[in-house]
Curated annotation (Swiss-Prot):
Keyword terms, alphabetized: ATP-binding, DNA-binding, Metal-binding, Nucleotide-binding, Repressor, Transcription, Transcription regulation, Zinc, Zinc-finger
GO terms under biological process: negative regulation of DNA-templated transcription
Function summary: Negatively regulates transcription of bacterial ribonucleotide reductase nrd genes and operons by binding to NrdR-boxes.
Zinc finger extent (unnamed): 3-34
Name assigned to this protein: Transcriptional repressor NrdR
Top-level taxon in the UniProt lineage: Bacteria
NCBIfam families: transcriptional regulator NrdR
UniProt remark on cofactor binding: Binds 1 zinc ion.
Length: 149
């Protein structure tokens, strides 16, 4: 690491500690040229795959879009914010775990439906009705029947 004072390349780590519930590392460093000390923080960079939409447009993964879609389905339902965050994190972990650089938006939609089914059946039906473009009451009934199985 370059020294921020003299820009020398040679520095040594004097002390390392975990901070932020173990999600990052704080390091005290000392320059071997000018002997100045400074602090650095290391955080793992977790790259999310790009999303390939049904029309083949590619866009960066948007966690806010994922969360807002789920929250819209869960509106006025008895589900805690913590449970929603756990579901969002589960989906993100699954997407990162694929190891793919790109994932289909359809996969994300299916993961959302899977999580909503666990959280709240009404929210699941709300989301499914939009996601699967239900055309009539019969399709609602069929989906509800599948839930009851």
């Amino acid at each position: 690491m370059h020294c921020p004072f003299c820009f020398a390349v040679d520095t040594k780590v004097i002390d390392s500690r975990l901070v932020g519930e173990g999600s990052s590392v704080r390091r005290r460093r000392q320059c071997l040229v000018c002997n100045e000390r400074f602090t650095t923080f290391e955080v793992a960079e977790l790259v999310m795959p790009r999303v390939v939409k049904s029309n083949d447009v590619r866009e960066p993964f948007n966690e806010d879009k994922l969360r807002s879609g789920m929250l819209k389905a869960l509106e006025k339902r008895p589900v805690s914010a913590d449970d929603v965050e756990m579901a969002v994190n589960h989906i993100k972990t699954h997407l990162r775990g694929t190891g793919e650089r790109e994932v289909a938006s359809k996969m994300i939609g299916n993961l959302v439906m899977e999580q909503l089914k666990k959280l709240d059946k009404v929210a699941y039906i709300r989301f499914a009705s939009v996601y699967r473009s239900f055309e009539d009451i019969k399709e609602f009934g069929e989906e509800i029947a599948r839930l009851q199985d």
